[in-house]
Amino acid sequence: MENNSRTMPHIRRTTHIMKFAHRNSFDFHFFNAR
């Protein structure tokens, strides 16, 4: 886990945003895309 943070420090931020956006963004995009 520590190695991942050093290799990809932006992944930690992306994961947090993806989890948060996954609920709103993904749901909205999926509904609109359909």
Curated annotation (Swiss-Prot):
GO terms for biological process: regulation of translational elongation; transcriptional attenuation by ribosome. Residues 1-13 are annotated as: Sensor domain. Changing F28A: Loss of ornithine-dependent translation arrest in vitro. InterPro entries: SpeFL. GO terms for molecular function: rRNA binding. The keyword Oxidoreductase does not apply. It comes from the Bacteria. Changing I11A: Loss of ornithine-dependent translation arrest in vitro. Residues 14-34 are annotated as: Effector domain. Keywords: Leader peptide, RNA-binding, rRNA-binding, Transcription, Transcription regulation, Translation regulation. Changing the amino acid sequence by 2 frameshifts with minimal nucleotide changes indicates the peptide sequence, but not mRNA structure is important. Binds ornithine in stalled 70S ribosomes, blocking the upper two-thirds of the exit tunnel. Contacts 23S rRNA and ribosomal proteins L4 and L22. A small protein (arrest peptide) encoded upstream of inducible ornithine carboxylase gene (speF) that controls expression of downstream genes (speF and patE) by nascent chain-translational arrest and transcriptional attenuation. In the presence of ornithine a toeprint due to ribosomal arrest can be seen on the speFL transcript. Only L-ornithine (not other tested amino acids) has this effect. It is thought that in the presence of ornithine, ribosomal stalling on speFL prevents binding of Rho transcription termination factor to a downstream rut site allowing transcription of the operon. An N-terminal sensor domain binds ornithine already present in the ribosomal exit tunnel; upon ornithine binding the downstream effector domain compacts in the exit tunnel, causing a shift of 23S rRNA U2585 which blocks the action of peptide chain release factor 1 (prfA), causing ribosome stalling. Belongs to the speF operon leader peptide family. This is Leader peptide SpeFL. The gene is speFL.
